[in-house]
Amino acid sequence: MKLPQPRNLIIGVVIALIVVGMGLVIAQDQETLRVRTSLATSAEAYPGYLAKLTGHALTSGDRYTVLTNGDAAFPAMLEAIHEARHRVAFEGYIFNSTSDIARQFTDAFVAAAGRGVDVRLVFDSLGAKVSSDDIERMTKAGCHIGWYNKVRSRAIEEVNYRTHRKALIVDGEVAFVGGIGIDDQWARDMDKEQRCRDTHVKVAGPAATDIEAAFNENWIETGGVVEPDVVPHDPNPRGPASSIVIWSSPEGGTNALKLAYLLSLAAARQSIDIQSPYLITDASTEWSLTDARRRGVRVRMLVEGDVTDAKPVKFASRAQYGQLMQQGIEIYEYQPAMMHTKAVIVDGTLSIVGSANFDNRSFELNDELNVVVFDRTVAERLRGDFERDLGKSRRLDLQSWRSRPLHIRAREKIWSLFGEIF
């Protein structure tokens, strides 16, 4: 099955630039960041510790709802837009306006603007496919549209820097983040082999304020203006969870998102469960995973199987599986559909969910948006989904892996050379 995704276009353009010598580097020596931490004194202190080190605020009083697949996410998101009273903010990498589900979102945006709601939309200029008719319709209704990082002929290398975020914020009080794009491959009426297995979360409470702040940064980046009346305010507490909203940008200096992952892996004492379509680790993340195994932590990674939207990235990912399995890390390939969930569960208490894949592109190149959630109920729900997905997956065997045909190993090794741009 072929899933038409802009990631393949990005890969092709960037590789072409490398080939013609325009200064992009395939690989370079990087200092390995080795992170260790300790929860020996108090596990309760860890959220504040993580917030201080990443430079992002810790909120409390958040209520999370896990939304498994578009079946659950789309109705909840559309209902929130229909109920909006003051403002709607949306940032998306994938928005295919010709799809049935995107038409429903377009209708909802238009209807909200028509009743006086301030509707602001940020689309990635490469990933989103919005027809001129839909742009005109939304604009005439009063929607404000910004295009992230338009590709310019004099700065063609900027094609490599995208907003990969998937976020919806309503009235500064409720927000949705995760991996689900606005396209029919996430919709319920698609054939199961053409669908994406994915996860979103809905959060009501103070964390929604920080998600809106992340949106405002990119809204300004696209040329938009943030008026005083849309500056986020702290909504009332809604639930028992504490959380840290972490957003990243290639222009933002130290990558707080990557640091959050490394610190969370270092904090694990029992288990680490990772879901990500792509698995391209650098020296720092590989060290953190293997160090966890040395501490006796069980590490399971659930990745895409035969159904993929980017074969070169899949080949590059598979080149690393052997060395990870050799350290005792369990790797499973999801079989029924494309695995697109981006989630990490640590010790059944800490969860990370959002738009970031477990790869270099998400950690170093894309604008991403994730939430770190400290709530056992959320972690248990995500782990339940993880276990169900394992039942539809194939575990890779190290001995069989080492017996792969030479041409397959060579293909994977060649594509792994481009790992830092994937």
Enumerate the language-model features and the residues they cover.
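Charged, low-complexity intrinsically disordered terminal segments
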Residues: K2-F422
